[in-house]
Amino acid sequence: MRVTNDFLLGVANMGNEETVYVTLDELAAKESVDAGTRQIPYVVFILGESTDRNHMSLYGYHLDTSPYLKSRHAKGELAVFDDTISCGNGTANVMSMVFNTSTKERDENVCWYKYPNMIDILRKAGYYAVWLSNQEPVGRWGNFDRYYAKRSDTCHFLHISGSAAGGGVAAAEYDEKLLPLLDDYLKLNQQPKQYYTIHLEGTHENFRRRYPKSFAKFTAEDEPGESDEQKKMQSEYDNAVYYNDYVVDEIIRRFEDKNAIVFYISDHGMDLYDTGDFAGHSSEEKGSYHMIEVPFIVWASPSYKEQNPDVWARIKGAVHRPYRTDYIMHTIFDAIGVTSSSYEVKYSVISDEYAQLKRIYNGALYEKQRS
């Protein structure tokens, strides 16, 4: 399986660690923040990994890979956005944009840490920020995770062995190991406003390592691949998607009795022989739409909906709008009523002022390539 060398972005554009933190501190000090009047007590951002929404039954896939979220959707609990693409093909590239005001169109000479970030802004808005991760804090892909985690009030990584040291993805625990940690924080954290980043290992290859045996629901016989090897890999990926559905649902379940809103996206997608003899994710120049078509889901608790019916109506009414994940910070802020000097309402997909952007992929409009 071939994967993009997007870790080169992390190495070349990471910056000296001391310089990074000094710059982030300066930006945070300059940022003007208004916490607003909604005062949502619980805000959760789940960042998944390598999940192509075209392999989710929630989005119409032929195998029942997302029964838990489908059940919630059938009950009207979810807003399922069906035209959202990732801002990049690889984790490091996406991480350099999703948590800050940087975008795909940014000046390439301006490093990621020179843009105001969501964690610092939410903390200035009075949120106690918790970072829970099943990804690596050090290594080819882990550096962004570490930097953003350290901007939080507290952070916890399930494993710390970096990919460069032979650990990383291979050393990852099952994502459900994050659930007891989340339970502990919810039990012990007495802060009135809490923000959680939950970074999953998701459906990252090696797929068969992403789920326990009890979630081995699909076999090669269920798959359309041209060879036994392809079918086996596809079935393992679909099992990983199935398990990921369970984990996301379990996270949501923990906020059902609270005034809470949960956002879920995957960092990027995955091509499994969908467009040719290729499995993995590549550079954009060699990429396919499967590598960027990601799930974007919003769940809100009954309490949130009762207190913010107008906002929930806007969220539900925006599910068919074209969007890209490097602007998600603005949507999150809009949903919880936080504004700042870096917030731009036109980038919130749920806003009446949303300005649809041109989504360029591999030098051409994404819509034209997909039609």
Language model: regions and residue ranges:
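Histidine-centered active-site microenvironments of extracellular/periplasmic hydrolases
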Residues: 60-64, 260, 265-308, 343-345, ...
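Metal-dependent active-site segment of extracytoplasmic phospho-/sulfohydrolases and closely related
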Residues: 44, 240-281, 329-333
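Active-site-proximal alpha/beta segments of enzymes that process anionic O-linked groups
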Residues: 1-45, 50-224, 293, 324-355
